[in-house]
Amino acid sequence: MIRNRNAIRLLCLLCLLVHPAINVNLEAQTIIGQRNDSVSHPLIRHQLGFDIRPGYIVSTHSFLQGDNAQQKKIDQSLSFHFKYAFRFGKESNLGRLFPHTYQGIGVSYHTFFSPVELGNPVSVYAFQGSRIAQLLPRLSLDYEWNFGASFGWKKYDELSNPQNVLVGSKINAYINLGFLLNWQVHRYWKLAAGVDLTHFSNGNTHYPNGGLNVIGGRIGIVRALGADEAPGSITPGWLFIKPHVSYDLVIYGATRKRGLIGDDVSSLIPGSFGVAGVNFAPMYNFNNYFRAGLSADAQYDESANLKEYRVGEFYSGDLKFHRPPFRKQFAMGLSLRAELVMPVFSINVGVGRNLIYSGDDTKGFYQILALKTYVTRHLFLHVGYQLSKFKDPSNLMLGLGYRFHDKR
């Protein structure tokens, strides 16, 4: 029953994430500026794509090096991707603000050539890409990120899959970043090839959570649907925002697992623990694509500093704890934030340090990576992850945010 509830939560989250990507009538960002000329241009351009992505699995554990049922290395992967995307037309405000950006949803099939122990998962994800540099009239250097959920993993099981200590859940996050050479071979056709990085994990919601990392290549084709401008055609002038300060308020929550190491024994604390937090960040909008600022962060973690309140002297067996006082599980800090701004989505990164805390678990630096998905002009979904001390997995950050004084 608990597994079913977790699956339903992840499915609902994924639906909420991709819904704005396909709802092209967002009040937030699709105010259209029609021109009074005799030429009609589509306000939304659609495209379909197909990718093949071979990869090398980074060897992070003995399971991948041969300590598995096959008794051989697991170091190869292959995936097939089918994608739908749209771009805002050159006559729309967003098309003039972000003339080379596309976004959409994709479905992919992955194999690691170990179906019994890892499975052959299927991913559903949102994605977005844009141009980094125009190299030649028909050749550009682009980037593309993918973010979603992957289903159908074979997870760790003490009896049936005891050596797989990398995957602790049947559903895992799928994160990918690629850099591509994009060649316009025809008015309607593009060829793309490049390199990418992929990460699979469950966000510390289940143990084990070793995760899987892939370095690979990719080659694909894209077919534009309907009318499109020919390469070198004249487009309307770009729009540029005026620099200004906006304010982001985010409220989030999640659950997490917690393990303890003591007396040379590694133990998993039974059950899940709640996490809740709030961020308030004044952000200076430098240009169309970038804003940065300082965020005041507060977080309560129900699993923090439990080690100090353990009942008994041993780390093995049935672990029990007294409930720590609130001050031991609450922390406040400041973080530097930078954000890549695009239509529909923004990517936020932060590095911070707790200033008000009590206990080792809340001491020191923390790092944040978050995806913001706009639902209205000011309201956005927040899906993030937090690390502690630059290396320790901490918790998901699933919530809602609101932007004040947005002059875009």
Which residues does each predicted region cover?
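Outer-envelope beta-barrel architecture signal
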Residues: 42-48, 97-103, 137-143, 187-191, ...
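Repeated loop/turn-to-beta-strand initiation elements of outer-membrane beta-barrel proteins
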Residues: 58, 91-93, 183, 187-191, ...
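Residues on the lipid-exposed face of transmembrane beta-strands in outer-membrane beta-barrel proteins
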Residues: 50, 80-86, 126-132, 145-149, ...
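Transmembrane beta-barrel strands of outer-membrane/channel proteins
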Residues: 48-56, 107-109, 143-151, 193-199, ...
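Surface-exposed strand-loop-strand hairpins of Gram-negative outer-membrane beta-barrel proteins
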Residues: 57-79, 117-118, 257-279
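Outer-membrane beta-barrel "beta-signal"
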Residues: 213-234, 393-408
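Outer-membrane beta-barrel translocator/channel fold
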Residues: 46, 52-70, 93-96, 141-175, ...
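Residues that define the transmembrane beta-barrel architecture of outer-membrane proteins
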Residues: 44, 74-80, 118-124, 169-175, ...
